[in-house]
UniProtKB/Swiss-Prot annotation:
PANTHER family: CHORISMATE SYNTHASE (PTHR21085:SF0). It comes from Thermoplasma volcanium (strain ATCC 51530 / DSM 4299 / JCM 9571 / NBRC 15438 / GSS1). Pathway: Metabolic intermediate biosynthesis; chorismate biosynthesis; chorismate from D-erythrose 4-phosphate and phosphoenolpyruvate: step 7/7. This is Chorismate synthase. Belongs to the chorismate synthase family. FMN binds at G281, K296, P297, T298, P299, S300, R323. This reaction introduces a second double bond into the aromatic ring system. Pfam families: Chorismate_synt (PF01264). One of its GO terms (cellular component) is cytosol. PROSITE patterns: CHORISMATE_SYNTHASE_1 (PS00787), CHORISMATE_SYNTHASE_2 (PS00788), CHORISMATE_SYNTHASE_3 (PS00789).
Length: 366
């Protein structure tokens, strides 16, 4: 059974494929009477859009979001919101060879096992990174709503290969690698140029910080903040790992080191440290929510690779054609940011912090 939806009260469905006429999202449950900020949504589409720099895929798409339902006179009207993004720069001929020869590291083989000859293999079909475009469109709508409540979500490239950012020194979107540090951005750019020349690719790590969330967001047991964010993050192609707070480092610490002592500041209960990433018992503590994801290298590379012919079961070789990112993690930054917003807004609606009519509970906590 295929389920193309995310969310519990606020729901998101996807449709389309990489080389189809369009891709899109359907958002159901969004509060009524909210003015849809089209310019804001388009800004995040531009952050994700391919072809903007030499270090991203040269598939040049306009990625203009068209809303065909759920909006009346610029405001949400209570019905499902349908967002469509056209595919205009498609070259399917690159993928004919892949019909019988699956790319290592890609979903070509698993799609064949599951759907056989009915699978859509062109451009990766509905499992392509292209499907992150409608994720951004829907997520940017939620992010704008949380922005209005004073909830700030920031995602950035913590590292590309061995180039690591130690501190945020500017807006990540002012740097082409999304590493918010001038020196490290320059180093990463040089690394990516070399990677491209060699026909290879490289992975990266994306860190996210959420500030301004009230305590108590999250629904134990199976709808915890961690489980809901994790489910969403693993819907992003190439994401292979996630950790919250100090994550795996906590396994090496003592309880006296890992526990975050409570304190009071200006009448608000906070913690002196934040090793647990602002989450305890699956619910927010009021401290910043922090998590990191690992994104594997783009599997489509221009180096010759060993594979198997699916029909003959004999060994074969493949050199992937087409236009691909040397580091797919870079364009995933706005995807992570926007999808995080969607999940958190859904959890806030589940917990009664926000209702279908835009009423906000405990506004003073925000």
């Amino acid at each position: 059974m295929v389920m193309f939806y995310l969310g519990n009260v606020l729901k998101l469905s996807l449709f389309g494929s990489s080389h189809g006429e369009s891709v899109g999202s359907l958002v159901d449950g969004f509060p009524v009477g909210y003015k849809i900020p089209l310019d804001y949504i388009q800004k995040y589409m531009e952050y994700r859009r391919p072809g903007n720099t030499i270090i991203t895929s040269q598939r040049k798409e306009e990625d203009v979001v068209k809303i065909i339902s759920g909006m009346h006179n610029g405001f949400t009207d209570g019905s499902p919101i349908t967002m469509i993004i056209e595919n205009k720069n498609v070259i399917s001929s690159y993928y004919e060879e892949l019909k019988e020869n699956p790319r290592p590291g890609h979903s070509d083989y698993t799609l064949y096992v599951k759907y056989g000859d009915f699978r859509n293999y062109e451009g990766g079909g509905f499992l392509s990174g292209r499907m992150t475009a409608p994720l951004v469109a829907a997520g940017a709508l939620a992010k704008s709503y949380l922005d209005s409540l004073g909830i700030k979500i920031t995602s950035y490239m913590k590292s590309i290969g061995e180039v690591t950012c130690d501190e945020i020194r500017g807006d990540p979107y002012n740097f082409e690698t999304r590493i918010p540090d001038p020196e490290k951005n320059s180093l990463a750019t040089s690394l990516l140029v070399d990677i491209m020349k060699s026909g290879d690719s490289i992975g990266g790590r994306i860190d996210t910080i959420v500030e301004g969330l009230p305590p108590g967001v999250g629904e134990p047991f199976f709808n915890s903040v961690e489980s809901e964010i994790s489910r969403a993050m693993f819907s992003i192609p190439a994401v292979k790992a996630i950790e919250f707070g100090d994550g795996f480092t906590l396994s090496k610490m003592k309880g006296s080191e890992a526990n975050d002592p409570f304190t009071v500041l200006d009448g608000h209960i906070l913690t002196k440290t934040n090793h647990n990433g602002g989450i305890l018992g699956g619910m927010t503590t009021g401290m910043p929510v922090k998590f990191s994801i690992a994104v594997k290298p783009t599997p489509s590379i221009h180096k010759k690779q060993d594979t198997i012919n699916l029909i003959s079961k004999e060994k074969s070789e493949i050199t992937v054609k087409g236009r691909h990112d040397p580091c797919v993690a870079i364009r995933a930054v706005p995807v992570v940011e926007c999808l995080t917003a969607f999940v958190l807004m859904d959890l806030m609606m589940m917990g009664g912090f926000i209702d279908r009519y835009g009423n906000v509970r405990g506004r003073s906590l925000l």
